[in-house]
Amino acid sequence: MIGYAEIATHFRRQITDGELNPGDAMPSYTEASDQFGVNRTTVIRAYDILKSEGLIVSRPGKGTTVAARPSIVISGVDRLDRLSRTGRRYGPGEDSTGHRVMWRSAYDAEVCRALEIEPGDEVVIRIRTFRQDGQPTSVGVSVYLPRTVTEVQELAEEGRMQGYFGDLYTERTGREVTKGQRTARARQASQDEIDALQLNVPAHMAVAVLVTNVTFHDEDGPLAYWEDVYAPGAKIPTA
């Protein structure tokens, strides 16, 4: 039987291929249920994934439509694909440092939307700086819901996990982890990010950085939101 992940993939492909364009109406829950022969809950779960990826939006009185596309879709192989495929955490000459794990209240609108939480809800944040041949290239920030951390104990203390968290989560729970579409956008770097990337810029100078993000789900909803902040000119890992 088709599941929510397959339904999300079907519509994601239609949106990215241009078969569905910004402003186009999505099938109603009932229409999509009939189309795929599934119950309404499965369709809602699939639509929630697409909403978390910024691909569709729901508005009172207007139903669900395809969203505008300010983000760039990242294609090809990324660090997570490499880890799943080869078991290698790092590419040649790559490592990471500054691993930290902390409990915090979430206020970032993008994180709250992706994880379907309210501003101020408690999350677990894992931070590390990736380096290529000793030079910082990106800051990795992973935001986890508390239920995720309960199942993946390797998040404790140093924040180093033995393997991909999705595999660990599946081993502990039996639930499959679905990785959403990775997208990118530009924004201004925080001072902490400037320091971690060792950018030599005058104090208080605005620095534009490329930010990629992806959200993970299981059958019960969002699990984690991962963000990588790249130094200007840095190459996104693709092997």
What does each model-identified segment do?
Residues 2-8, 34-35, 42-122, 149-161, ...:
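HTH-adjacent hinge/linker in prokaryotic transcriptional regulators
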Residues 6-24:
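Short helix->loop/beta-hairpin flanking segments within DNA-binding domains
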Residues 117-118, 135, 146-239:
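C-terminal regulatory/effector modules of DNA-binding transcriptional regulators
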Residues 102-106, 127-129, 212-215:
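Generic short beta-strand segments
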Residues 18, 23-36:
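A short alpha-helical element within helix-turn-helix/winged-helix DNA-binding domains
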Residues 108-120, 125, 129-143:
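Catalytic-core "active-site belt" of small-molecule-metabolizing enzymes
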